[in-house]
A protein has these predicted regions:
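Phosphate- and other anionic-substrate recognition elements at nucleic-acid/protein interfaces
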Residues: 1-191
Length: 191
């Protein structure tokens, strides 16, 4: 896998702020070799940042299934040429609309299955531990780890008016570490 070009993606999938990190390469995993795609309902984030981060507005929807389908269609359009994708698993401590989250994710998994795209599920605690060293890391800790690793302060760049790290910054960071974890796992398995 070290010298072979591959296209992989890490998906932080949700109803309110889905984000996909696409990496194409055969060597070291770097931020510059990634492209990020996210959906937002905030117009000022629906644009490109730094040349490799691309935000789009959510599509209009009237019923839940229409919403799930539009998000999954958006994702599959980006993921069609991937050799492998990794999806963050469910947070079993989650509260609220957990069945909506499961239905939404189920639509994506089904569409990826139809496309023949292999999916690996990574538990949220593994993503957090891989990114920050702590399996219970919060958004601030993940952002701090990302800045330390990449030298890029996405919060200051994209959401300078927000007090805390939130969407879309936290979604981009999570998708980055989901993709990087899969890249690392693929390299290890090829040894």
């Amino acid at each position: 896998m070290n010298h072979m070009m591959h296209k992989i993606a890490g998906i932080d999938y949700s109803l309110c702020g889905p984000c996909i990190c696409v990496f194409e390469g055969g060597g070291r995993f770097t931020f510059d070799d990634c492209c990020f795609y996210f959906l937002t309902d905030t117009k000022k984030y629906a644009k490109s940042f730094m040349g490799n981060i691309h935000g789009e507005m959510f599509s209009e929807w009237n019923v839940d299934m229409e919403r799930y389908q539009s998000i999954a269609d958006w994702a599959v359009d980006i993921l069609k040429e991937m050799h492998q994708v990794s999806l963050e698993g469910y947070a079993y401590s989650a509260t609220g609309k957990v069945f909506h989250i499961a239905e939404n994710t189920g639509v994506l998994k089904y569409k990826l299955f139809q496309e023949g795209i292999p999916v690996t599920i990574i538990p949220p605690t593994e993503v957090k531990k891989f990114g920050s060293g702590k399996g219970n890391a919060d958004k601030q800790m993940m952002h701090h780890a990302f800045v330390k690793e990449t030298g890029i302060d996405l919060k200051s760049l994209m959401t300078p008016d927000k007090k805390d790290v939130g969407s879309p910054v936290s979604d981009i960071i999570d998708s980055y570490y989901i993709c990087k974890k899969m890249h690392t796992d693929l390299l290890v398995s090829s040894l």
